[in-house]
């Protein structure tokens, strides 16, 4: 497979993106321009794909390697301070390059380090999950958790190069399912060619189309982000499609439900809410369900988690104001609107989902 290369405009910057297989060697082409290399890598990725990543000796003697454990618990001030301490002790200059290889949580921490150490290091992102390739590595957001609040500390900071190596996606089908919730979301937002591409594919032939799916997803998200980079005018909120319910599911399940399953189920529930109040074409619900089924994404059993438990987490959502939340819902494929939704309306949607999809 020949690598695809394109330039992604982002908030006045031009980000280079390379998509292909066995392309991590592109890192070596960049290192010579800098005083030193800070190489942050996921421990899981290193154990599974270490032979696919060029040896650090290739990058010269002034390399600082930092191995990280994946997971939300990584994103703490303590871990951030430990890394900064290493960089200070190693006298890492501002003319240094930070490269991260890993999933979304590694990218969050690495992005925050790059943005803040000496007011900014140049950064290369090598996201290793489908979710990170199509979502968290795009848009500039990074963040740390504090006092049990996710991403309460963070910046907007872009890599200048993103290397999407598709070899990382071949380790397990779970990586595909986890990311396809977001890809399905993009297909509903954009409609057209994206919806057709995702509809024509399935879990069994995903790798034949992965480069196109990743590229199309990136461009859809980037187009939305560029109209509201700092998340202030409401345009970027369209990317929350499916996520009001998904965040409630993830919180109420104590993280036991994967993000992909939560988002796919959230898309269905939110479409039910839109349909009940006359805003969503009824067939949209079945179309979302068919996509999820094609990629083997199991629907969440809402009744096992509890409607009230989910509502408790949603009621604490920072977007909830004066008893309602502005929630994006699909009026149709390719047509997203915003509804003012109360907790009662969300409760009705969750209970409708239980009746329609859990008791048949």
Curated annotation (Swiss-Prot):
Free-text remark on how the cofactor is bound: Binds 1 divalent metal cation per subunit. Can use either Co(2+) or Zn(2+).
Cofactor(s) this protein requires: NAD(+); Co(2+); Zn(2+)
Family annotation (InterPro entries): Dehydroquinate_synthase, DHQ_synth_AroB, DHQ_synth_fam, DHQS/DOIS_N, DHQS_C
Enzyme Commission identifier(s): 4.2.3.4
Example of a GO biological process term: aromatic amino acid family biosynthetic process
A GO term, aspect molecular function: 3-dehydroquinate synthase activity
Keywords, sorted A to Z: Amino-acid biosynthesis, Aromatic amino acid biosynthesis, Cobalt, Cytoplasm, Lyase, Metal-binding, NAD, Nucleotide-binding, Zinc
Subcellular localization: Cytoplasm
UniProt pathway: Metabolic intermediate biosynthesis; chorismate biosynthesis; chorismate from D-erythrose 4-phosphate and phosphoenolpyruvate: step 2/7
Protein known as: 3-dehydroquinate synthase
């Amino acid at each position: 497979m020949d690598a695809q290369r394109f330039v992604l405009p982002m908030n006045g910057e031009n980000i280079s993106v390379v998509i292909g297989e066995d392309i991590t060697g592109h890192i070596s082409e960049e290192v010579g321009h800098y005083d030193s290399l800070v190489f942050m890598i996921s421990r899981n990725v290193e154990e599974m794909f270490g032979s696919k990543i060029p040896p650090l000796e290739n990058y010269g003697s002034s390399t600082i390697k930092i191995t990280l454990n994946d997971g939300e618990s990584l994103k703490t001030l303590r871990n951030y301070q430990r890394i900064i301490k290493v960089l200070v002790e190693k006298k890492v200059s501002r003319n240094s390059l930070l490269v991260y290889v890993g999933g979304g949580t590694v990218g969050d921490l690495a992005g925050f380090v790059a943005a803040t150490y000496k007011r900014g290091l140049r950064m290369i992102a090598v996201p290793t999950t489908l979710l990170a390739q199509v979502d968290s590595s795009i848009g500039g957001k990074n963040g740390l958790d504090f006092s049990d609040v996710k991403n309460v500390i963070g910046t907007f900071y872009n890599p200048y190069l993103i290397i999407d190596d598709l070899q990382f996606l071949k380790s397990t089908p779970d990586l595909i399912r986890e990311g396809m919730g977001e890809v399905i979301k993009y297909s509903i937002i954009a409609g057209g060619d994206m919806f057709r591409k995702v509809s024509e594919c399935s879990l069994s032939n995903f790798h034949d189309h992965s480069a196109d799916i990743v590229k199309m997803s990136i461009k859809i998200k980037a187009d939305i982000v560029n109209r509201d980079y700092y998340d202030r005018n409401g345009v970027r909120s369209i990317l929350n499609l499916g996520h009001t319910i998904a965040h409630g599911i993830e919180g109420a399940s104590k993280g036991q439900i994967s993000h992909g399953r939560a988002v796919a189920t959230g898309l269905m529930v939110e479409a039910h809410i839109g349909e009940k109040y006359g805003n969503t074409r009824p067939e949209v619900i079945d179309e979302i369900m068919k996509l999820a089924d094609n990629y083997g994404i199991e629907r969440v059993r809402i009744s096992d988690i509890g409607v009230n438990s989910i509502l408790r987490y949603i009621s604490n959502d920072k977007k909830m104001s004066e008893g309602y939340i502005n929630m994006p819902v699909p009026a149709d494929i390719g047509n997203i609107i915003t509804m003012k939704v109360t907790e009662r309306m969300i409760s009705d949607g969750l209970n409708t989902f239980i009746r329609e999809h859990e008791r048949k």
